[in-house]
């Protein structure tokens, strides 16, 4: 099986200068769509599951599904990642069920709603890093709170999102604090806050530097050139997908996502992992709506799901090609987690923060 840790994959991405989209999964159809896209362009992939996805699909089902995908597509390096873990138990149970990487989001407290202070974030993230590295699993941390610079609010997704009004000091990661955070927590990747948010309704207009602070990414990369940065909430919310949904009975108000060209710019400034969920949902549900309206007599779920899978596959392939991930799968020789654990223990994988 071709399961790979996040650390090894992002190390390779940094060496070769590309980024890796991280696609969220809830079911078999999404998994197949992602892997078909990866096979079509010889790309490694990150598949991630939120706590909501784990509850929806069941940990055992998800674990067996990932085993199956790795067996069906043995040539594709596949990282299975826990998205937005809220405490140590969430992260450790993910590893127990076969995840090769976890995110400990200590920017919020365990309720996934209350913004946490810096010391809390450092303490819990460092504990998860220490435990995960024992077994060779990778850890992503988060510094700063995801949310809109326009509204000062965060968008909840799968029960995860800050409540109340947030100021810019919370919504933008401080570069100097980022250095201290990486040094103290030993994370393998750092999710930063730059004005992006979960869901479809990210921006009320095409984003510029006032509401999408790419300058923050640049500043952090200058201070932490060897740290893998992560952009969350980075769906582009394509106009054509909004139009398909609304043409077939949907009622999505006009909205704007993170432009692909801005993500590509971020990749040049150290962004190695790019979280994408909403775009995949829109690609699939647009086809559900189309088929329901065009063929109202249809009742075979496969007649809905196959076109939806194809649409998501095409979306994923576009992102893999745009981010430079395409053509990289065959260049990677996977390091087993046991060997990664030895490298962590030796200090060889300690972050460079000087």
UniProtKB/Swiss-Prot annotation:
Record GO biological process: glycolytic process; reductive pentose-phosphate cycle
Residue numbers annotated as active site: 83 (proton donor)
Protein name as catalogued: Fructose-bisphosphate aldolase 2
UniProt keyword list: Calvin cycle, Glycolysis, Lyase, Metal-binding, Zinc
Keyword Signal in annotation: no
Native source species: Cereibacter sphaeroides
InterPro entries per the UniProt record, alphabetical: Aldolase_TIM (IPR013785), Class_II_FBP_aldolase (IPR050246), FBA_II (IPR000771), Fruct_bisP_Calv (IPR006412)
Record's function text: Catalyzes the aldol condensation of dihydroxyacetone phosphate (DHAP or glycerone-phosphate) with glyceraldehyde 3-phosphate (G3P) to form fructose 1,6-bisphosphate (FBP) in gluconeogenesis and the reverse reaction in glycolysis.
Extra remark beyond the main annotation: This protein is encoded within the form II ribulose-bisphosphate carboxylase operon.
């Amino acid at each position: 099986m071709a399961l790979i840790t996040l650390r090894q994959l992002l190390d390779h991405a940094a060496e070769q200068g590309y980024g890796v989209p991280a696609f969220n999964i809830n079911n078999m159809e999404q998994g197949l769509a992602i892997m078909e896209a990866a096979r079509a362009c010889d790309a490694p992939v990150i598949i991630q599951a939120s706590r909501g996805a784990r509850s929806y699909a069941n940990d055992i089902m998800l674990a067996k599904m990932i085993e199956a995908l790795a067996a069906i597509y043995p040539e594709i390096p596949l990282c299975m990642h826990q998205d937005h873990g809220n405490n140590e138990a969430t992260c450790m149970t993910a590893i127990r069920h076969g995840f090769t990487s976890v995110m400990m989001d200590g920017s919020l407290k365990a309720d996934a709603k209350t913004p946490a202070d810096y010391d809390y974030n450092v303490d819990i993230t460092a504990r998860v890093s220490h435990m995960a590295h024992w077994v060779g699993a990778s850890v992503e941390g988060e510094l700063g709170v995801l949310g809109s610079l326009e509204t000062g609010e965060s968008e909840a997704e799968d029960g995860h999102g800050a409540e109340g009004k947030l100021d810019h000091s919370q919504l933008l990661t401080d570069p100097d604090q980022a250095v201290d955070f990486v040094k103290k927590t030993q994370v393998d990747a750092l999710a930063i806050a730059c004005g992006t948010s979960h869901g479809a309704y990210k921006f009320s207009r095409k984003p510029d530097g006032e509401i999408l602070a790419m300058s923050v990414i640049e500043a952090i990369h200058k201070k932490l050139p060897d740290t893998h940065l992560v952009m969350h909430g980075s769906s582009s919310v394509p106009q054509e997908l909004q139009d398909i949904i609304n043409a077939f009975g949907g009622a999505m108000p006009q909205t704007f996502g993170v432009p692909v060209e801005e993500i590509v710019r971020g990749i040049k400034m150290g962004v190695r992992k790019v979280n994408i969920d909403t775009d995949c949902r829109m690609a699939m549900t647009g086809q559900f709506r189309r088929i329901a309206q065009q063929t109202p007599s249809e009742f075979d779920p496969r007649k809905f799901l196959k076109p939806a899978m194809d649409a998501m596959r095409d979306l994923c392939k576009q992102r893999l090609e745009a981010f430079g991930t395409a053509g990289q799968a065959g260049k990677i020789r996977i390091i087993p987690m046991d060997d990664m654990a030895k490298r962590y223990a030796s200090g060889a994988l300690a972050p460079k923060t000087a």
